[in-house]
Amino acid sequence: MNVSRKELRVLNVLAQGGRILKHKDENGRLTHVACVTPEGWQLSLCTLEVFQQLKRRKLISSVKGGPYLITRLGLQALCGSSKTR
């Protein structure tokens, strides 16, 4: 699976225990996402476009409105891309 460098870095943070938090406006539209590392740092590479690409490919998911975490498919994409480099 073709995964960009930005997506790989975000997936790597999520695999280490990070999470993606979403921010919505008063109309319920998604305006901003923040990728937070397990140490509490914010990853600047995680833009709305990267988030939408990861979600569209089902590499991340949310359970009951919680933060977005990496899925098994995301872990496979992360492990598969590290073997080719």
From Swiss-Prot:
InterPro entries: YjhX_toxin. Signal peptide: none annotated. Belongs to the UPF0386 family. NCBIfam families: PRK13687.1 (NF010240). This is UPF0386 protein MXAN_1729. The lineage of its organism: Bacteria, Pseudomonadati, Myxococcota, Myxococcia, Myxococcales.
